[in-house]
């Protein structure tokens, strides 16, 4: 019944950080590394310190070089600044080529017109706080719960916090694989046929694979139907966000995205095909800035990443394949 689809955000937490060319680190870079270590409460062995300083200095230089050029977005230091992109891919992203083109559309697009901008965060208490997936490739679960939390709140006026850990532990029969990855569309199907998902207070997040502990008597949110938006139909995504609720989508994360800080993310290094997506997030709105169309997107790397846990990404160009497998749930309320 369920076609095999790719995994998102999969990957074990490996210790190798990838090779970094030896740098001559200057005093300014050492100062910023020391400050960054204090901010992020980092400690290292002597050997590890030397390696992490090298990686940090390399990332610092990339950030400075990027910000001096004419880009639509700025980079900044964050929790990833002592890691190479090779290490980040092992820890947070699925490193093999992916393909979500098997997702079958059932969305019927209207003719508009639609508002020039939309931000569900400004529509009352209908977008839950930014969460942090931590040391688990579970972005797909946070995209799923974020979409359903908003859909329920919009339909009923009740905001709740749903259990990502239930999806990590229990949704394997729908081609999801816990901390090794999955897709929101498949997670919505699981909730639909499982007849519910528990709240996070009853099924707290631990950020690692565990035994399924679902208790149907404690289910608090339910899915009536799952809507899969047509492959690469970004206009349909706009309609869905404008008229209905936030939309889950996947895209390809490349190195320049990891240090995103502000502005509208756009990249020439990512692919626009459905076979490369490796991270799932939640579109909560859209708009335009200086003639540049963008999506407002909720991430799952904590509120200290990006712009309070959010980022903007260019809209209308299928940037990094973001229109490859978008979906949202219709809640049963």
Swiss-Prot record:
GO cellular component: acrosomal vesicle; alveolar lamellar body; axoneme; cytoplasmic ribonucleoprotein granule; cytosol; extracellular space; lysosome; outer dense fiber
Glycosylated residues, chain numbering: 228
Signal sequence extent: 1-20
Chain residues in the propeptide: 21-95, 104-113
A GO term for molecular function: endopeptidase activity
Encoding gene per record: Ctsh
Record field: catalytic activity: Hydrolysis of proteins, acting as an aminopeptidase (notably, cleaving Arg-|-Xaa bonds) as well as an endopeptidase
Keyword presence, Disulfide bond: yes
Gene3D superfamilies named in the record: Cysteine proteinases (3.90.70.10)
EC numbers on record: 3.4.22.16
Protein name in the entry: Pro-cathepsin H
